[in-house]
Amino acid sequence: MVARRKGERVVRKNEVENVQQRACANRRERQRTKELNDAFTLLRKLIPSMPSDKMSKIHTLRIATDYISFLDEMQKNGCKLYGHSIFDEKRGYNLQSAFNMWRGNNGYTPIAGPSQLPPLQSAHIPPPAPSSIPPHCLMPQPWYQTCPPPKQEFHELCPISTPNPNSNPNQLTPIHWQ
């Protein structure tokens, strides 16, 4: 039996506690990083981007900032870009194309650095009143989605043919699109 000194035992106990604390801290940091990455993934899905955009975290934040400025301008101008409505009779509101055009005309580029971004006019910009923003301007619009024209009824989008009384009820009636 080897005799141990009192101090030696305390050192080993402290080492075990340190290892456990480090493991807990690492676990918390991994969880925090995962939550942050999940939030960026969601943000990347919500903001429109161009295929040439490198969607790093900082670039994602820059595009999100640009998109907020764009939506604010759309709200102030009644969903008009440079005096023209962004509503298309066939495709609805195409925020993706309008945002890309706005970004290009305002000098925002995928590689813009902090020195190239326009300065803020004021430190505090109050949010617009929720009732003053048209609902169709608030909906996030990924590149593959467009809004239907306002007040267009579902039956106009999906016409239903009237059944022929002489036809077999088990037979499908073709739909004739207008």
Swiss-Prot record:
Keywords: Activator, Developmental protein, Differentiation, DNA-binding, Nucleus, Transcription, Transcription regulation. It comes from the Eukaryota. Changing E29K: Dominant negative effect on function in transcription regulation and mesodermal cells fate specification. Delayed development. Impaired vulval and non-striated enteric muscles development. One of its GO terms (molecular function) is DNA-binding transcription factor activity, RNA polymerase II-specific. Residues 20-71 form the bHLH domain. GO terms for cellular component: nucleus. Disulfide bonds: none annotated. The keyword Nucleus applies. It is found in: Nucleus. Acts as a transcriptional regulator. Involved in postembryonic mesodermal cell fate specification. Activates ceh-24 and egl-15 during mesodermal patterning. This is Twist-related protein. It comes from Caenorhabditis elegans.
